[in-house]
């Protein structure tokens, strides 16, 4: 169980120490390279002094090799997340450099004489290529940093700014809430007597009342005049509804003629009603049709009798007399024969 618990801690440590080890390896490689370069420069200067003060210019390949190591760590850095297990050559170099540093011996660098022996034909065209080398140096010095370098610089600057902001936020003192302040004040202050508590309470109540009064004053006044008018109208409506409605007297209409005036006076006196009662027939068997026929007989009178009388060829005259409802009787008319 102890081994299982210690394994994850060791893995975490290895993950944390990975980038630091990578950075330390790169720093050591740069230091070794700089030492080798300084030794080469010293040996070249010593040879030049012995040879009569002529300073041979470094060949083009050496200049390019001297420029490459400064760019190599940035390209191989991979922002601290490279897998060093896939680079056995670099690991061997790192182990060799560490052994040299631990033993205290200076790092072994190839002498320029050996390089000249390996490359005997380089001095022949040193003078010819010197101008080209100077131009390339100037162009390389004038060229700005590559896009990868600028991206890495921007990322590094952004990360540094974010870290500074987080650090400032952590260092900023938090503003305590009013409840916490009240609690601290109450704890720091000595215990108050009941009279002081009552005084404080009354003062707070008075302040709240003053605030409420100020709010009420700021509110607009209600239209009291309109309310009074509405009350008056309401009371008047109640009074008029409670009273019994009086019949309005109609204006007298002028009667057009004297006949109407006489009938009016007769109605007022009651003569018309008496006359109508007297005119009503006593017999209840009479129908409206019979009454109309009776009126016709009365109006025409003798003309009807003359018309109903008929003469026969014998010279006698007869007439029909109504004996009942729809019944007539033939009666001989006394008198001489028809003319």
Swiss-Prot record:
The modification N6-acetyllysine is found at residue 327. Keywords: Acetylation, Cell membrane, Membrane, Phosphoprotein. Residues 185-196 have a biased composition (Polar residues). Residues 32-43, 51-61, 117-140 have a biased composition (Basic and acidic residues). Transmembrane segments: none annotated. InterPro entries: Caldesmon_LSP, Lymphspecific. GO terms for cellular component: actin cytoskeleton; extracellular exosome; membrane; plasma membrane. It is found in: Cell membrane. The keyword Protein biosynthesis does not apply. Phosphorylated by casein kinase II, protein kinase C and MAPKAPK2. Phosphorylation by PKC induces translocation from membrane to cytoplasm. Phosphorylation by MAPKAPK2 may regulate neutrophil chemotaxis. The modification Phosphoserine is found at residues 24, 111, 177, 188-189, 193, 252. It is a peripheral membrane protein. Residues 300-315 have a biased composition (Low complexity). One of its GO terms (biological process) is cellular defense response. Residues 1-198, 294-315 are annotated as: Disordered. The modification Phosphothreonine is found at residue 175. One of its GO terms (molecular function) is actin binding. Activated T-lymphocytes. PANTHER family: CALDESMON (PTHR18949), LYMPHOCYTE-SPECIFIC PROTEIN 1 (PTHR18949:SF1). Binds actin. May play a role in mediating neutrophil activation and chemotaxis. This is Lymphocyte-specific protein 1.
């Amino acid at each position: 169980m102890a081994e299982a618990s210690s394994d994850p801690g060791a893995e975490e440590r290895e993950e944390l120490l990975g980038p630091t080890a990578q950075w330390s390896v790169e720093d050591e490689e740069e230091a070794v390279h700089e030492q080798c370069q300084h030794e080469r420069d010293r040996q070249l200067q010593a040879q030049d002094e012995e040879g009569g003060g002529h300073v041979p210019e470094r060949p083009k390949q050496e200049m390019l090799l001297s420029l490459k190591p400064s760019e190599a760590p940035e390209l191989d850095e991979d922002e601290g997340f490279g897998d060093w297990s896939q680079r056995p050559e670099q690991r061997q170099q790192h182990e060799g450099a560490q052994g040299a540093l631990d033993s205290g011996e200076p790092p072994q660098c190839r002498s320029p004489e050996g390089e000249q022996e390996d490359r005997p034909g380089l001095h022949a065209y040193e003078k010819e290529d010197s101008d080209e080398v100077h131009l390339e140096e100037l162009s390389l010095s004038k060229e700005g940093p590559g896009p990868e370098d600028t991206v890495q610089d921007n990322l590094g600057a952004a990360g540094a700014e974010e870290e500074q902001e987080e650090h400032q936020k952590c260092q900023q003192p938090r503003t305590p809430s009013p409840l916490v302040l009240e609690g601290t004040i109450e704890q720091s202050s000595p215990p108050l007597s009941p009279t002081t508590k009552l005084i404080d309470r009354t003062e707070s109540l008075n302040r709240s009342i003053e605030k409420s009064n100020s709010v009420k004053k700021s509110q607009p006044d209600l239209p009291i005049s309109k309310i009074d008018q509405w009350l008056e109208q309401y009371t008047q409506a109640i009074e008029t509804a409670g009273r019994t409605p009086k019949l309005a007297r109609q204006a007298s209409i002028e009667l057009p003629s004297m006949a109407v005036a006489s009938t009016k006076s007769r109605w007022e006196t009651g003569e018309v009603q008496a006359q109508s009662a007297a005119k009503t027939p006593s017999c209840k068997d009479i129908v409206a049709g019979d009454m109309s026929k009776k009126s016709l007989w009365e109006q025409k009178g003798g003309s009807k009798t003359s018309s109903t009388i008929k003469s026969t060829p014998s010279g006698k005259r007869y007439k029909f007399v109504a004996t009942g409802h729809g019944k007539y009787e033939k009666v001989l008319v006394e008198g001489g024969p028809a003319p």
